[in-house]
Regions:
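Conserved AMP-binding/adenylate-forming core of the ANL superfamily
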Residues: 1
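Conserved AMP-binding/adenylation subdomain of ANL enzymes
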Residues: 4-22, 29-117, 146, 150
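Extended hydrophobic secondary-structure segments that form protein cores and membrane-embedded regions
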Residues: 22-26, 128-130
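Active-site loops of AMP-binding adenylate-forming
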Residues: 136, 145-149, 157-168
Length: 168
């Protein structure tokens, strides 16, 4: 019953996923979050699931996202945080960018540029990144909210199949 309830919930919050869309499965299917939102839900709506053929590393994941161009990205916080630390933080720490981030109008220009680069890093065609399976770094989450990045954080546990709460 809990699995069916999670599928019904996912159908409401991810209405754009259908037989014409794709996801990259990078989480282990032994993990309820990965099983539920990278396999069972996709099967229920007929979406294409692309499995990684090797153990996921940042490079393998980024290559898969670029190749598949998924409609939804399902990830654990560690994946998102590694992308943030490797692609975003070095740019934001440059002296000129730090200065621009202090200026009211120009900071939004910088944020929009960073957002575009991040969207492209995730394949460029997704409409949402769903983060769950562990606590999300508050600095990264606050920055993603500030720039208007399309992400959602889910909270849960295996015994609940797995979603308990969903912060949209």
């Amino acid at each position: 019953r809990a699995i069916r309830s999670n599928i019904e919930f996912a159908t409401k919050v991810l209405p754009g996923l259908d037989c014409t869309k794709s996801v990259v499965s990078m989480l282990p299917s032994a993990h309820m979050y990965g099983l539920m939102f990278e396999l069972l839900y996709e099967l229920s709506v007929g979406a294409h699931v692309h499995f990684l053929s090797r153990v996921p590393s940042p490079k393998i994941i980024m290559n898969a996202l670029a190749e598949v161009k998924p409609s939804v990205v399902i990830a654990v916080p560690l994946v998102i945080e590694k992308i943030y630390k490797s692609k975003v933080k070095p740019v934001l720490e440059k002296e000129g960018i730090r200065f621009l981030m202090k200026l009211p109008v120009l900071n939004q220009v910088v944020l929009n540029k960073v957002k575009t680069e991040l969207i492209n890093a995730f394949g460029g065609e997704f409409y949402e990144v769903i983060v769950g399976g562990a606590a999300f770094n508050t600095e990264v989450e606050a920055f993603f909210k500030r720039m208007g990045f399309p992400f959602t954080v889910g909270y849960g546990m295996t015994e609940c199949a797995p979603i308990i709460a969903y912060d949209d």
